């Protein structure tokens, strides 16, 4: 399942997010979206988790949780 993670602190790195998500199971990929010109985080990203049950648990427990001083939004990503 592909998961959207929003309202991230701009200092959060992919490794930081990976560490949080690994508490709920393995993740295939973690990608924080960055501005093409500046290379700075846009404050959101995506996590791909192969186990849907683990992904649903992460969504249920982490949505609206405080992380690095911000209340994050986490939900199933919508297709483009």
Residue ranges and their predicted role:
Residues 1-76:
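Canonical RRM/RBD RNA-binding surface and closely related RRM-like beta-sheet modules
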């Amino acid at each position: 399942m592909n998961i959207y993670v929003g309202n991230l602190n701009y200092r959060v790195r992919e490794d930081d997010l990976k560490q949080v998500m690994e508490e709920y199971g393995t993740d295939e990929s973690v990608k924080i979206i960055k501005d093409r010109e500046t290379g700075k985080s846009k404050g959101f990203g995506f996590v791909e988790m192969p186990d849907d049950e683990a992904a649903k648990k992460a969504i249920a427990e982490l949505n609206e949780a405080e992380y690095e001083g911000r209340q994050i939004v986490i939900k199933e990503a919508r297709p483009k």
